Amino acid sequence: MCSLSNEITHPTIDVDAVRAKINDDSVRLIDVRREEEYNQGHIPNAVNLPLASLLSGDSPESVVKLFEEMGIGDSTEVVVYDDTFGALASRVAWTLQYIGHKNVALLEVTYLQWKEIGLKTSTEKPNIKPAKHSLNLNSDIMATAEYLESAKEKDNVVLIDNRERLNFLE
């Protein structure tokens, strides 16, 4: 799946803002690293969502259910982070925006940077209450095959494949 850059943005949130909201029940932090890494330490109150769980081709309804089980409702403020400078986190943020979630941001630092500057980490998993989330697909941010086919013929459109080199060569 691709996103149309003029239709979607992922604002960032700074460390101080996250620290101030870490215990706020209306905020959900999502750690997109592998489960083993999450279990070794994460930002307090963060839930784990390995990216592979979103890439299995599930229906939008299944994706909404997954986020609901993580305590993400329509009004939940979501902060996503990873250890790849946003490469994985941005995919989760895009997915949230695709299902119609309005309030999502990327943490401006990686987990490793968070840890290196001496901020608090935890190995405890938070107690999560499931939430209710609507499904309002934002199909304008999906670049379909038809869109790409017509866009490649236009002079004012630049198509950029931002996959990592190994994924691009597969």
What name fits each language-model region?
Residues 2-7, 54-154:
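Thiolate-centered catalytic microenvironments shared by cysteine-dependent enzyme domains
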